[in-house]
A protein has these predicted regions:
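Bacterial N-terminal signal peptides that target proteins for export
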Residues: 1-9
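Intrinsically disordered, low-complexity segments enriched in Ser/Pro/Gly/Ala and basic residues
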Residues: 2, 22-24, 101
């Protein structure tokens, strides 16, 4: 019997190793000295999609979902790049959209010098991984406890039933399925100093799912929900 249970535990270990890893929690870094309560508005840059595989329509959906959830969850005024350019253009009397097309270095310098006038913090984000994988659980043997009954008659002709349990092997064939593999990085900066105040890296893998956008949205919601908690 000991040898049977030893085989069972070895097979069980093989099954767990075959499953895709699920991150238990995001990895955060927070500046403990920063006063998040003084934040009144935030600049949300488009998420960087450079290192992830996606179509043009997927990219548009990713950006739209990202900004929509950030604005909804933060519950404080948030601005995107279009509004940022407009606000700074009005403040300095020059058209930032035109400058960005003709001189990227000057545009970057003007934004850096004037960002603090329109936002308290700004957030840069990056989509690192956006894929669908396949997990495989090898064929293995499970063990099931079954109850068996024996009936007999005693010397007086009375029928009795006794039960006893035993463990029996159950063969489980190989199984496979999809899982989403989505990883994002977030970095929030103080607009006045450029100092990093809150970063997060989160990998989420969801078994039996091929809905990458749903997994992506969960990560985005988690970050901005937690940022809101710090601000409140």
């Amino acid at each position: 019997m000991k040898s049977l249970f030893r085989v069972f535990f070895l097979m069980l270990a093989a099954v767990f190793l075959a499953l895709p890893h699920v991150s238990a929690s995001p990895v955060d870094s927070v500046d403990p000295s920063y006063d998040f309560h003084q934040i009144k508005n935030v600049m949300i840059y488009d998420i960087d999609l450079t290192d992830s595989a996606h179509t043009d329509s997927e990219a548009a959906s990713l950006q739209q979902n990202f900004h929509m959830q950030a604005a909804k969850l933060l519950e404080i005024p948030s601005i995107d790049k279009e509004r940022l350019n407009r606000k700074i253009s009005l403040a300095i009397g020059r058209d930032l959209d035109v400058i960005e097309k003709s001189d990227v270095e000057e545009y970057t310098s003007l934004v850096k010098d004037n960002l603090k006038a329109v936002a308290d913090i700004y957030v840069h984000s990056e989509l690192v991984s956006y894929t669908i994988g396949t997990y495989t659980i090898p064929a293995h043997t499970d063990w099931k406890t079954v109850t068996e009954y024996d009936t007999y008659r005693d010397s007086n002709g009375i029928t009795h039933t006794i039960s006893h349990q035993r463990t029996v092997p159950i063969f489980v064939p190989e199984q496979s399925g999809p899982y989403t593999n989505v990883k994002l990085r977030f970095s929030a900066y103080d607009a006045k100093t450029g100092k990093v105040i809150f970063t997060r890296e989160e990998l989420r893998q969801e078994q039996d799912s091929n809905d990458r956008l749903d997994t992506y949205n969960k990560i985005v919601r988690s970050y901005f929900r937690d940022l809101k908690k710090k601000i409140k």
